[in-house]
Amino acid sequence: MGSISHLPVYGHRLLPVVIDEIARDEPDRVLFYTPRNGQPSQGYDKVTTKIFANSINRLCGWLDSQLGSPTVSKTIAYIGQNDLRYFIMMIASTKLGHRLLLSSPRNSVEGHVSLIKQSGCEFWIASSGLDHHGFLQDLQIPSVEAPELSQLLDPTPLKPYVYQKSWNEGKSDILALLHTSGSTGLPKLVPVYLETAATVDGFHLMELTNGKRPTGVEWTGTRQLCAMPLFHVAGICLGLYSAVFFNWTVVLPSVGPIMQHVIEDALDHITLDSAFISPSVLQDISKSPRVLEKLSKLKFITSAGGPIPQSVGDLIHPRVPIMQTMGMTEGQWLASVVTHPDEWAYYYFHPRTGVEMRPYSEDLSELVFVQNPKLTATQPVFKTFPELDIWETKDLYSRHPKHPSLWKYEMRRDDLVILSNGEKFNPLAAEGKLISHPWIAAAYLTGRGRFQTAALLYPDETNLDKSDDTIIDNVWPTFEEVNRSLPAFAQIHRDFVKIVRTPFPRTPKGTLARNETEKAFTADINAIYDRSTHGKPSVHINGTTEVVVRSGIREAIEAVSGLVDLKDDDNIFTRGFDSLHVIRLAGLLSSAFDQPIEVEVGTIYTNPTVSQLARSVWSHLEHGPQDKIHHSEATREMLAKYAQAFEPPREAKEHIVITGTTGEIGSYLLDVLCNNDKVAKIWCLNRSADAFQRQVDSAKSKGLSSTWQSKAKFVRYDVAADNLGLSQDDLQEIKNQATAIIHNAWEVNFNLPLSSFEPQFVGLQSLVDICREARHKLRFFFISSISAAMNWPSDLLGPVPEASIPRFDAPINGYGSSKLVAEHLLSKAARSGVLSLSVLRVGQVAGPVKTLGEGSIWTRRDWVPAIIDASVHLRALPLDLGTASILDWIPIDLLTEVIGQLVVPVNAVVGQENYYNLLNPRTPSWIDALPGLKAHLEVSFSDKFEIIPLHEWIGRLRGAEKTIVKEVSEGSSETARRAQSGLKLLAFFEMLASGEEGSRGLEWSKGNTLAQSSILACMEPVSSAWFGTWLTQWGY
């Protein structure tokens, strides 16, 4: 290899000159791999420095033939397939002295026209297969089809077009005319000069920081997939600059829109060190265990173009390190240094960038470029704007709580949503959480100039045909999580959620174009707020008597909130009434009477029952507004209300607190306990405001008893708030009356690390604090999981004990670790005398087996239904289930009866700590169930089903993926749609298959459990009859 010592100093090198120099001195160095015919499955072509330089010469000749005299500088435009022609076109046009406009294919016609007029474009070039746009004729601009990439990469040597300018002569030549995203209006031109590009080359000049160089230099010699638009600054920086300046080998993506399959195609067909992937594509990948598994083979991934949602990053970074980079059209690539993998969301900007973080609000700072004469070779933004000394990026960051040099990108200044009351909030984190839901492809939060936040949701393509209510019902638990992270004024109410079926406008880099979205969906947004104001029926109240007023007020409350079975003395706030309901009720009542009356929100807050509010309104109608309250009467009423609670209980009945009753286990457990005569009262603590209605609907659909309302009281709680966010009245009532707590609510996500469960421990502490101050010593039942001990070394220590697990390597994942930590914390509380503890480790929960309602079904989200659905599509059943071949499953309706026996035992259980391993004591194997399962399916489908080894079954399912996806997209096969759930769990099935052949899994001690529960002791094994019930539930 020849010497290149004669090249100019870093930061003062002209890109066309560097390309010709390295082609001469390092002709065989591979710059790019480009997929043959745009398809990775056909292999990749190497593009060496020599071939690249020759392709530029070939295009120079073609441009000369099209444009005429090379001495006349013109502005030309190129729009094409996402391939190497973008880079070739940039260098060729620069060599010839032309200015190249790169207009994004995503631009509207209006956007294209605006850029043409701004740039003075005279000639339009497009690759084959792209529309040349009819508007060009109106503008009288000639257009032509570009040469195919294969033609340009012909290695036959051509006459070189030499770029002969010196640094001072060429630094102001334009490499390309890029443009802003247009997220706040029409796109604006941003010129990229050769001097601008050279500032990226200036990364070489930056000194070590924390032992590391800027990322471009640090990653020298790596082979990276550049899965970004190559007309965009991100693709240019990490595609062209990185290959030429930093000696990366850049693998270019397949043609077409950059989506998840583009990444997977590359991972399948070429060896990579890393991949450069946009946050929007990472979002899709985070929902695919299959692609995540492939991604984990890389050394790291890089991303830019917008923030990675926390929920997405938390899923990816345990598998492969994430290294974010920051860039902008005006400032190219912002030099940063690699951070610790756990700090993947943060940037460490190199000091030689000359950026400052200037306070913008209490928690946010704006990134600002400040011109420094000593940093001229490393400050690209002042090449773009030479007249400026300071450039405000409008990008807002938050400082790391422990490391002051680390900064996390939060949003653009324009992203802030400002409500009509002046309150501001950041919608991006909430949107990121919403799109982590598998049914949601995009989310947009708005509320500009409004009194309330609203949400638009765009479902993913597999759920577009579902009804709005079905989608919102499924996503609502995620909304509840979002609301816990939002300030109270910004929280999203169900009435302010709308499903749309038109994709949101996007910027060229794939991020949401907020202004365009607001404009494009104005009608939908207005409909949300119109519905909230006018959508409920008006109420007319004849204010002739207090009885009539009371009836009318009840009707008004039901109209604005949907509350049912509201009694006159029910506190509406404990029934789920919130601040938005108050505002709407005040407005409705103020216009409900024939005579003028203004019902203020304060009146509703101080009169929270139908009776009290009716009395207040009636008094107003009769006598005008009265400010005085009869304190003595109110005091006597309050005393009478709670006096009995402070007297000794007349009979030993249970008063039980349950967290999380609206879920699967909670619904059945509430039914069991309410039908137990020894249970007098149950407090149902749930996070959602509409838990009562959800419980009613769930009970009806499952065929459960609907008579539990007399025992159950629904209370909204917040796991992370002080005292769980309970009112003083509810808190005191629980402390005075409760005899037991069943802690059932816990986030179920097997992909999250332990740290993500920290809010659960805050809630656990609050429950223990209630135990400390309770009148009775509370029995605390913690619903744990066998995942807390799935790595128990039974070959050394025997069966998993009915005792505290002393090994912290016993859990199999973050979820299991969180359960184990909770077990140990509660054990400490029990040993200090605060409570009496029972830990219930729940195993595989199967579907119900009793004859119940249509809603009683083994949820299809579980892995067993997924196996059946996939087997139906394949017409083949697996011979075994690997390490899960032993069927120690318990149907959910029987499981909750077992829990009921443990919570309300015939004979009191003695001891401060009790541990129960809840698994079926009778354990047939999967192969025992196969004959009956096979026979049932063959009758149902009048077709034969094979039985094949699990490894082969997994291979068939993987091989059928393209067919399944195709049939789903065409809507031609219900079995294909159902089989998708199996595709999503391929990695899990492979984990089952990876265990030792013939492994029967762990053994679990159950002696104490069976002694305390006769139902479990006498439980039947999983049988053909049970499978028949489950198959019927699934529609087979």
UniProtKB/Swiss-Prot annotation:
Modified residues (O-(pantetheine 4'-phosphoryl)serine): 579
Residues of the Carrier domain: 544-621
Top-rank lineage group of the source organism: Eukaryota
Disrupted-gene phenotype: Impairs the production of fusaric acid.
InterPro entries tied to this protein: ACP-like_sf (IPR036736), Adenylate-forming_Reductase (IPR051414), AMP-binding_CS (IPR020845), AMP-dep_synth/lig_dom (IPR000873), ANL_N_sf (IPR042099), Far_NAD-bd (IPR013120), NAD(P)-bd_dom_sf (IPR036291), PKS_PP-bd (IPR020806)
PROSITE patterns given in the database record: AMP_BINDING, CARRIER
Cytoplasm found in the keyword field: no
Pfam family, one: AMP-binding_C_3
Pathway: Mycotoxin biosynthesis
GO molecular-function terms, A-Z: oxidoreductase activity; phosphopantetheine binding; transferase activity
Keyword Phosphoprotein: yes
EC number: 2.3.1.-
Keyword annotations from UniProtKB, A to Z: Multifunctional enzyme, NADP, Oxidoreductase, Phosphopantetheine, Phosphoprotein, Transferase
Record GO biological process: biosynthetic process
Enzyme class at the top of the EC tree: transferase
Domain notes: Contains three distinct domains: an adenylation (A) domain that activates the substrate amino acid which is subsequently covalently linked as a thioester (aminoacyl-S-PCP) to the 4'-phosphopantetheine prosthetic group of the second domain, the peptidyl carrier protein (PCP) domain, as well as a thioester reductase (TR) release domain.
PANTHER family: ENZYME, PUTATIVE (JCVI)-RELATED, PHENYLACETATE-COENZYME A LIGASE
UniProt name for this protein: Non-canonical non-ribosomal peptide synthetase FUB8
Gene source species: Gibberella fujikuroi (strain CBS 195.34 / IMI 58289 / NRRL A-6831) (Bakanae and foot rot disease fungus)
Lineage of origin: Eukaryota, Fungi, Dikarya, Ascomycota, Pezizomycotina
Gene: FUB8
